[in-house]
Amino acid sequence: MEKIQPAVISCGFCEHASKRSDVNMAELVYEAVDDCITKADSIEWKDIDCVINGNMPAFEGANMPELWMTDHIAAKNKPLLRVTTGGTTGGSVFISAYYAVASGLYDMVLAIAFEQQSCGDTTVGLSSVALGEVSIFPELGYDIERLRRNMGAGAAIGVASYQAMNYMKRSNATEEDLARVVVQNRRNAAKNWWTHLKMPNLTIDDVLDTPYISYPLRFGMVCPASDGACAVLFTTEKKAKEIADIPVYVNGVASVSNEPAIIGVDVSGAGQVDPTEQLGAVKCAEIAYGQAGIAFPNKEIDYAEVYSPFPNQELMWVERTGLFEPNSEPEAYKNGITAKEGELPINCSGGVNSTNAIGASAMERPAESVLQIMGKAGNQVPKTVHTALGHGWGGAINLITHIVLADEPRRKFK
């Protein structure tokens, strides 16, 4: 059987904001799709064989929106698949599109990920998922009373604050170190046309002057709720070389989940008690790097986009994905190693900390890495990027996606 190497030939975005009241959901997504296909030059809507899309319908309160926006997403009379995996939705959509091409089933696949959070209430959507799981806890023998003390009670920031405290304990990081990550992200976002929070003059003191939401995380440290969409166009290696000036090859993909840490902390589960361990992220990186033939990621990866709604997570993820030694990141950020001009630039798009359309966020990470390799990013790094990483996170700090991209096909088929 022929081994097919998928490649990305174009990525598109729409403008992100807290409320895109100028468009409805279909029009919002269309902007990203049109941007993607227009940038692909010779490609037309009719050339697309299949569309794979994803969002979190409960967050908008609109069930199966892809069925009434087919005319806006090049999906009319074509196979259409929806993928939903929480915060990792975009990464899962990306990987699904990769396999749709790698399997030989389709030659050209359009991947779309989006969220229009202003249409609904994300917290209510999250609660509906959580309550469904909590309702069966007594039947499984869990002590439901102890859940009140659990980090899950604070939703996303409740989880992240526990992570932050554990990471600070491990690494001796300070609140100033967390604020430094935020400043770098928001200043990067100011140089990228589609991002949400653009703050070119933000300082560490500005961040530290904001009130606590959940210690040690302050209001100025948390991600926004964004409306936005992203689209990525996949095809085969052969077609990519014919169409694109600089095709970007998907050399490694992985998705790994382990038991939610919120169970292990205080509900009598067997999960991890330290939410910064992230063994799922370590394993996910190991699988994807193995597929891509990468033995020393800290030396072979030129650029990375990691999923970090909160600054402590950015410090944590780049360590767990093998780009830096454990507990070394606060010093690396202080020394400018992860800056745009640094040795290993991280999140030059501004990251999830600056723009968070939840369904799209995990696909925007590899999409931005693709653009860095192509030399077409909004906040392009000065060095040449040959190999890059796109990382996603979702679930109860337990579901990870890991995507390795490069300017040469190096997929290790087994």
Q: Where do the model's predicted regions map?
A:
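Alpha-to-beta junction loops
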Residues: 106-107
